[in-house]
Amino acid sequence: MTKVTAQLSVSVDGFYAGPLFEGDGNWMDSAESAGFFRVTRWATEVSAWRERQGFAGGEQDTNSEVIAETFEAAGAYVMGRRMADGGEVPWGDEPPFRAPVFVVTHRPRETLLRQGGTSFTYVTDGVASAVEQARAVAGGKNVAVAGGGSLVRQVLKAGLLDELELHVVPVVLGTGLRVFDADLDLADKEAIELTPTRVLHTPQVTHIRYAVNGRAPLVLDDRGSGGGPTATR
């Protein structure tokens, strides 16, 4: 059964990139200074990621197994235009996806065909259309929302996301771009409810997978000590 999934590497305080990540320019050029590299470094050091990028070596450990599992489960991808444009040159003629990629954008462009099974189709009629087109060609495998963070929030807000995995890196950035920002636009006393389904801990990163249950009202639950608002369905 096809699931729509998303994964993001984040700091303990919830940032997936630092403040310099905003603004114009190629995000790949500014990634290291923006703190992006600090929360994704764990992935670049493992063999599964390096093999997809055409590099040798790398650690063969739990983190590598998580990366390999993610690639193998994906039958199609959805990503934002900024990520696609920023990756076009460094990914080269054989990008790591090896599957159709649907790029959410306001600017039309012809489909790009690359070696290894990767194609980039530019979708101008919204995130729901991109997800539906990806689902249609995923062959029963997952539709992976590759990012960036703004696109993940759009998919979550639209109720299209089935599974979210956060890779929590033991670092505090203090400022930058948050995974869950105000543009989720939740109503007053409303929450998006998640159920943890897997936790894998390593010294470099903790992988927490959630099933996305959808929106639910926040009500006052005074059972037990302390009470406080909780999400109920």
Question: What are the residue ranges of the model-derived segments?
Answer:
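Enzymes that bind and transform nitrogen-containing heteroaromatic metabolites
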Residues: M1-R233
